[in-house]
Amino acid sequence: MSKIKESSSGILGASNNTNKESSQKSARSIALPMTYALIGVSCLNVWNSALGLNIKITYNIFQMAGLLTSSVLALFVNYPRVLLPTSLGVLTLLCAGFQIAHQTFSDSAFDTYCLAAFITIGLMAGIAQTIAFAIGTTKESNMSGYISAGIGMSGVLIFCINLILDYIVSDEKIYEINKSKLLCLFSISEIFLIITIVCCVLYIDLFPKNDNNKDSTDIEKAEEKEGRLPLIEIIKDGYKAILSIFLVNWLSLQLFPGIGHKKWQEKHGMTDNNVTIIVGMFQVFDFISRYPPNFTHIKIFKYFTFSLNTLLIGNFLRLLFIPWFVLNAVISSSFFTNIVQQCVCIAALAFTNGWFNTVPFIVFVKELKKVKHQKDIETISRIMVVSLFFGLFFGMLTTCLYDYFPIGILNN
């Protein structure tokens, strides 16, 4: 009898262990995508908070320089994974710095802090995103789409909070920046950053060389005997994804907000309320469009991912947004000045922006023909991040080209 009891207890024990393992795997399968989404949210929250508060808006170019610098360096320096939570920690300190400097520094000292902070934000956010995309794309279940989704989520989150704060906080300003809104927005950013740091420590293997078995979902490394490819061969194999990510970001930042809404407002005298609606439309539709490509296992969303060839065709078709945006600026007929039509225009640009930003990171690994080594895949991911930031940078630069064209007003 005792043997039977021991045997049955052994079976029950094994069953309990199996249940525990399955529940742990289930929890991890939820926590890991959430962690990568939080990385996307947290990296953008600080920048979006500064934009929402209109803090030294001209300093955005310095943040972009920081993003480009950190992403280009990643091509030559292999950032250790531990820099992921470290860079997020620095962003947390910068948020606290904004709160302290705004209330205690002189105008010139605050201006100096903002300049240094924007450069550092660019560097730290660039490092965090580069590392996260490099790790995420080499997962068996590609996690890079969740980072992209988090990036879109940040814009909507900060925009909505900003609108709510307009109705519930005082109008007191220091250096033309609302004191209460600055405290609230950066406090929210700090909370997200702290949660993200904890999740990174818990769910991402930050020291893979010290534990070969810890992260079983990583794609197996190629045999060491199988040498890595030269950089030119890596670029040849991944150029479609690299070009796609550049084109989508270049066009989006060239047209928004430089042409629509700024040129529209300048030419037609749009109300501030309509401008807020248009900005909100971009944030919302950019956010919405980043999710369907991550859920293609659901039948209704299966057409939201496609080949990189199709994506390139889609990016060239997006060039049709240029005449549409320009016509909205130059023609004063009731159709082109109608807020509904303008919202449709912005929503279409935003939807394709979020959608076409997410697809390349999800599908490029499957379309690689020569590249098989994990480190080579990470290299392509880093180059794609560089291409993304270069697209944003050149989009900002080429917006000013429209100032050299005689965009007048054509009446009915």
Curated annotation (Swiss-Prot):
- GO molecular function of the protein, one example? nucleoside transmembrane transporter activity
What ranges are annotated Cytoplasmic (topological domains)? Answer: 1-29, 78-81, 136-144, 203-240, 295-310, 365-382
Question: Membrane topology for this entry?
Answer: Multi-pass membrane protein
Q: What's its catalytic activity?
A: inosine(in) = inosine(out); adenosine(in) = adenosine(out); hypoxanthine(out) = hypoxanthine(in); guanosine(in) = guanosine(out)
Q: Do the record's keywords include Cytoplasm?
A: no
Q: Which InterPro entries match?
A: Eqnu_transpt, MFS_trans_sf
Instruction: Give a Gene Ontology cellular component term annotated to this protein.
Output: plasma membrane
Chief localization = membrane
The answer to whether keyword Transport applies is: yes
Q: Where does the record place Polar residues bias?
A: 7-21
Q: Where is this region: Disordered?
A: 1-21
Q: Which UniProt keywords apply?
A: Cell membrane, Membrane, Transmembrane, Transmembrane helix, Transport
Q: Which subcellular locations apply to this protein?
A: Cell membrane
Q: Where are the transmembrane segments?
A: 30-50, 57-77, 82-102, 115-135, 145-165, 182-202, 241-261, 272-294, 311-331, 344-364, 383-403
Give the Extracellular compartment stretches of this protein: 51-56, 103-114, 166-181, 262-271, 332-343, 404-412
The family note in this entry says: Belongs to the SLC29A/ENT transporter (TC 2.A.57) family.
The entry's function note states: Nucleoside and nucleobase transporter with a broad substrate specificity.
This chain belongs to the protein called Nucleoside transporter 1
Supply the source organism for this entry. Answer: Plasmodium berghei (strain Anka)
